Amino acid sequence: MAKAKKPVKEEPFENQLWKAADKLRKNIDAAEYKHIVLGLIFLKYISDAFEELRSKLLAGEGEYEGADPEDKDEYKAENVFFVPEIARWSHLQNNAKLPTIGKTVDEAMDAIERDNPSLKNVLPKVYARGNLDPTNLGGLIDLIGNIAFGDAKSRSADILGHVFEYFLGEFALAEGKKGGQFYTPRSVVELLVEMLQPYKGRVFDPCCGSGGMFVQSEKFVEEHQGRVNDISIYGQESNQTTWRLAKMNLAIRGIDSSQVKWNNEGSFLNDAHKDLKADFVIANPPFNDSDWSGDLLRQDGRWKYGTPPTGNANYAWIQHFLYHLNPKGIAGFVLAKGSLTSKTSGEGNIRKELIEAGLVDCIVNLPAKLFLNTQIPACLWFMSRDKTNGGFRDRKGEILFIDARNEGHLINRRSKVLSEEDIQKIADTYHKWREVDGEYENIKGFCNSASLDRVRELDYVLTPGRYVGLPDEEDDFDFNERFTTLKDEFEEQLKEEERLNALILENLNKVKLV
């Protein structure tokens, strides 16, 4: 009797979509191709949302009785972008096989911007460029147009938003180091948001990249049965192409991005939200940034706890975040791990002042390999303007240290992610510690609530490992995973050695002896 075949696990549709889109990329650089693909996904989203409302207006039933389907105000009233005829997806799909399709898409983007001022200078107009083959562009339009998006709701916000987010992550992986400039790994964003719990109030990210922190904040509110309208977002980004991605990413989610600003001077030199006092600050600023114009800001009023060094912006970012917190506000952000110990150019003194002012609430040591753009070890800082209450227990004179270096799992030899269980474990530890009736306990090797006196004893060093100690079971690690990782790294080094030797030999052969 023949054995029954095991059912083949179907590949997630976003995976299939990515592979198909990647095949059409040909020789186009990932950094350029992302704007081509994401722009089309956005166009499909707004066209679908427009057509859905237009069909209701055409039917003219109930609340839509007597409505004019060509009246832009009808769409504006329902937070739907007006899409002129030449920009509707049906028009693009009908012209997808023509050699002029690139020009047609660019004209569609222009037309949408003209009719929707909030999208001015946001959409990519790159489709008529010579390096984009019209046949491949037509194939991409067919691919995106033929996705089975289900019912209206999932088609617009959920599915297309998910595809957009998934593609952002895949493009970040494809770009490697540069990808990290516009994308924070999803599991890191989820951890920050889960720990901060932004149920209600103003959420601010002064280096917002493609807007992932905002998207996750809105998801958090929805998942906890809150009202999305209870939070408002404020952001700033200095890279215009990244800002455009953020505006599209947020629009697909139906999130108001009117307060997400761009200027090329950046948050330090040209603060777009000078008077903002936020309930939550959530951010992933550039690690150890030496090019932040610190020499022009020596006397800046934000440096209440000490003037940051010109060669490293870490402590400038910390004080910028604090400046924008309201008296009950909480900040959570990613920094290079060196920020926990550095004493260079007065950084140790600033850290001491922050600790003595009772602002540092919790420090989390992150696992290696979470970030695409750097191998620099990273950590999370959580700072609170009011540790005496702020809706929680009085935590004055205490700091929680969490060492999460052993959490997470490898998805390939270079990248790790935190699972939902990892995120919940870390977030729950913080919540139990700060809540009035939280059942918090120190766990050797993982977490410790340290007194201010203990931090003073250790000279204001904030490395969690110094406080949590070693776990009782030191040999409890996955040998196979550790061995595989080391083997892969060794093989990479051998390949690099071979490449460099060949390069040296090639250059030596070019040298002509006189």
Give residue ranges: language-model regions.
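Non-catalytic, mostly N-terminal accessory regions of nucleic-acid modification and defense proteins
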Residues: 1-199, 261-272, 365-368, 386, ...
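Conserved Class I SAM-dependent methyltransferase catalytic core
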Residues: 16, 23, 32-33, 37-45, ...
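Short, contiguous acidic/charged loop-to-helix segments that flank catalytic cores in large enzymes
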Residues: 27, 292-312, 338-347, 367-373, ...
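Conserved S-adenosyl-L-methionine
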Residues: 178-283, 288-292, 297-304, 315, ...
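Active-site proximal loops enriched in glycine and acidic residues that flank catalytic Cys/His/Asp
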Residues: 208, 237, 264, 285, ...
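Switch/connector loops and helix/strand junctions flanking conserved nucleotide-binding motifs
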Residues: 243, 269-272, 288-291, 341-344, ...
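Active-site lining segments that contact anionic ligands and/or coordinate catalytic metals
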Residues: 277-278, 300, 312-314, 328-332, ...
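Accessory, often C-terminal, charged low-complexity segments
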Residues: 287-309, 314, 352-356, 389-393, ...
